[in-house]
Amino acid sequence: MTLEKTNRMNYLIDFYQALLTPKQRNYMSLYYLDDYSLGEIAEEFEVSRQAVYDNIKRTETMLEQYEEKLALFEKFEQRQQLLQTLKRQVELTDDVSATISALENLE
């Protein structure tokens, strides 16, 4: 599993966890946030490894469907990019203001 997929799933879990059942939340939290293996989760809940795998895959699909319809993560990423752009613009404005002040204060 790639780091990018793990990060995406962590965000989707954060955004859509209220739409998941308690069992789905538990499995996803243990698997993605706490880095449990399928076997460890199966042992914890006294179910088969295959049952855990199937539940996680179904939940991943559900989370992607929620994101497709609601786009909370996509909008979050867009806000983050715009915020970074705004911060750079403010820094440039501060630099320009300082240069103008320096020019005005020259004798």
Curated annotation (Swiss-Prot):
Name of the protein in question: UPF0122 protein EAT1b_2891
Protein purpose: Might take part in the signal recognition particle (SRP) pathway. This is inferred from the conservation of its genetic proximity to ftsY/ffh. May be a regulatory protein.
Transmembrane segments: none
Family recorded in the similarity comment: Belongs to the UPF0122 family.
NCBIfam families to which the protein is assigned, alphabetical: PRK00118.1-4 (NF001068), PRK00118.1-6 (NF001070), YlxM (NF045758)
